A protein has these predicted regions:
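Bacterial N-terminal signal peptides that target proteins for export
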Residues: 1-11
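Bacterial N-terminal signal peptides
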Residues: 9-19
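N-terminal substrate-binding region of glycoside hydrolase catalytic domains
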Residues: 29-159, 164-170, 205, 209-211, ...
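Aromatic-rich peripheral "rim/lid" segments of glycoside hydrolase catalytic domains that contact
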Residues: 32, 36, 59-78, 163-164, ...
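Glycoside hydrolase catalytic-domain groove-lining segments
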Residues: 72, 229, 238-298, 318
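An active-site-proximal structural segment forming one wall of the substrate-binding cleft
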Residues: 107-112, 116-118, 130-159, 175-194, ...
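Aromatic-lined carbohydrate-recognition surfaces of secreted/lumenal glycan-active proteins
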Residues: 183-221, 276-296, 323-335
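Substrate-binding cleft/loops of secretory-pathway carbohydrate-active enzymes
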Residues: 209-240, 334-342
Length: 373
């Protein structure tokens, strides 16, 4: 079954649930809809994902090679004076082993030479024959954190990716056996390693996709509540929400609603309805670990991408105080392929030749205006 077919199933389930419970709110069991609380603005730690975006589905689609010099120059232009820009380095797959860890270490060092901080997404994505082997997985997490966490420019780790999303194994870990257990074990293992390194302030979290089906989403959070140990709860610093209005959920724009409306509702439901199911409270920060909009003909123009970026960032900053939102990451820096057909081929602030789209300047202005110094 394709990624799009799974989305159709999810849409049908959500529509059916909404029809049965039209008055559902953040207090309802299925967390279908909610109005955001009264706005309490705050500053945000901003970041972006450089490199290649993962393609939806089983394997990686077409992506033009990264040009390191052009990427570095773009990042230097994007970071305003007096503001920090964090780089979210995705796709450190378990099946990449020590060789991939070394490549990530080289990337971290290269970015650090330009004065940029990095955070690392450690993917479950198991090697052949190791799926469900949590002891081996924990060893990989410890090795990755030991090698990368000792670097002063590494500020955070995200353990696993979108484990509530059981499709698209190239981008999400939810397709793999024992993925939720892997996240819990991985966070504990990472925390132990960071303490041994003398770096307990490096932040640890996990990410969820917004969204799948009501039953699956509810079960995910309830199962997490049962699996979470006291050590896990002490180790967890943040939950990252990966929200793509008009691309993933909702798959098309809803008349009368802005991108910011969709992002604010997603964060309200995660904070007020889903996290309580796992007994995760205000001690855990909320991040937007991925948000992006494509510039795809027939879907969205470059001007439309810029408009949706501004709407989303403004919504996040407006509710930073009341929802405990501390961080926002745009996905991605550059298009994989500006003429590509994948969902995520054209989500960059730059075209594939590194020329800027209008959203590039808008994001820089947003960082300068709303960013934490």
């Amino acid at each position: 079954m394709t990624f799009r077919q799974h989305l159709v199933i999810a849409i049908g389930a959500l529509v059916s649930a909404a029809a049965l419970a039209p008055a559902a709110s953040a207090q309802g069991g299925d967390c279908l809809t909610a109005d955001p609380p009264s706005a309490e603005p705050g500053t945000i730690n901003f970041g972006i994902t450089p490199g290649i975006a993962g393609s939806a589905g089983v394997g990686q689609g077409t992506a033009l090679p990264v040009i390191n010099k052009a990427e570095r120059q773009a990042l230097e232009r994007l970071e305003p004076r007096g503001r920090d820009l964090v780089l979210r380095l995705n796709r450190l797959f378990w099946d990449g082993g020590g060789k991939l860890i070394r490549k990530f270490a080289n990337r971290v060092d290269r970015y650090a030479r330009s004065g940029l901080k990095s955070e690392i997404q450690v993917r479950y994505h198991p090697p052949e024959g190791k799926e469900g082997n949590l002891r081996a997985w924990a060893r990989f997490v410890r090795k990755a954190v030991r090698r990368l966490g000792r670097r002063p420019s590494v500020s955070a780790f995200s353990i696993t990716n979108e484990i509530n999303f059981p499709v698209s194994p190239n981008t999400s870990d939810g397709s793999y056996d024992r993925a939720l257990e892997a996240m819990v074990r991985g966070v504990v293992a990472a925390n132990r390693e960071l303490r041994l390194l003398g770096r307990p302030n490096v932040e640890l979290g996990f990410s969820v996709a917004w969204r799948f089906t009501p039953d699956a989403d509810r079960n995910f959070w309830e199962d997490l509540g049962e699996l979470a140990t006291p050590r896990y709860r002490r180790a967890l610093d943040y939950v990252g929400v990966q929200v793509y209005p008009g691309l993933v959920w909702p798959p098309v724009e809803i008349p009368g609603r802005t991108a910011g409306d969709e992002v604010a509702e997603a964060l309200t439901l995660v904070r007020g309805c889903y996290m309580p199911k796992a007994d995760l409270g205000d001690e855990v920060d909320l991040w937007v670990s991925e948000n992006g909009y494509p510039t795809k003909p027939g879907v969205n123009s470059e001007a439309g991408q810029a408009e949706r970026l501004v709407s989303s960032v403004n919504a996040v900053a407006a509710h930073a105080g009341d929802l405990g939102i501390t961080d926002y990451r745009w996905f991605n820096l550059r298009d994989n392929d500006s003429d590509g057909a994948d969902l995520f081929s054209q989500v960059g602030l730059l075209r594939d030749d590194y020329s800027p789209k209008p959203a590039f300047a808008e994001y820089r202005r947003a960082i300068r205006r709303l960013g934490d110094s």
